Amino acid sequence: MESKVVENRLKEAKLIAVIRSKDKQEACQQIESLLDKGIRAVEVTYTTPGASDIIESFRNREDILIGAGTVISAQQAGEAAKAGAQFIVSPGFSADLAEHLSFVKTHYIPGVLTPSEIMEALTFGFTTLKLFPSGVFGIPFMKNLAGPFPQVTFIPTGGIHPSEVPDWLRAGAGAVGVGSQLGSCSKEDLQAVFQV
């Protein structure tokens, strides 16, 4: 899937469910439950046992954009791409990982936090960036970074409650990553997110 298509689908999804589990079966059940609630983008972290198998089991579903998260090595990136990940996310920026992923036809979203990291990511041509950990710094932090970097689409992730997602989207986020707190949300709770 082409990068522009992936970026557009992530923006349409608005919320990216970040799956971090101790068990492969539990992770698959979480994903199915989230799909029933209307979630359309899922990032399976590579701290989850069997992450590649989980991605592979959802790769042909048309109702989901499935990606790999917490990818910190070229080996993990290769495994994720082979499993069928439609996007790959790392918690930070690594020039080595960025260079490796330039040869893989999977959309890459590097993580950043500082202006220096953003500038380095831009030199590699990345304009959609995971802002991590966003919940600690809040919306004003993202807005301050957007001032000098208007060409960047931020995907804030880390410590964000689902009820806060609409505020992040209104502040300019392209999409928002949310983790474990999604499990307690009902389909109705998530409608507020999808309406923004």
UniProtKB/Swiss-Prot annotation:
Q: What induces it?
A: Induced by galacturonate and negatively regulated by the KdgR repressor. Is subject to catabolite repression by glucose involving the ccpA gene.
GO molecular function terms noted in the UniProt entry: (R,S)-4-hydroxy-2-oxoglutarate aldolase activity; 2-dehydro-3-deoxy-6-phosphogalactonate aldolase activity; 2-dehydro-3-deoxy-phosphogluconate aldolase activity
Q: In which pathway does it act?
A: Carbohydrate acid metabolism; 2-dehydro-3-deoxy-D-gluconate degradation; D-glyceraldehyde 3-phosphate and pyruvate from 2-dehydro-3-deoxy-D-gluconate: step 2/2
Cellular localization per UniProt: Cytoplasm
Going by the record, the broad EC class of this enzyme is lyase
Question: CDD domains given for it?
Answer: KDPG_aldolase
Give the matching Pfam families: Aldolase
The EC number(s) attached to this protein equal 4.1.2.14
Instruction: Name the chemical reaction catalysed here.
Output: 2-dehydro-3-deoxy-6-phospho-D-gluconate = D-glyceraldehyde 3-phosphate + pyruvate
Catalytic residues (positions): 43, 130
The identity of this protein, by name, is 2-dehydro-3-deoxy-phosphogluconate aldolase
Annotated source species: Bacillus subtilis (strain 168)
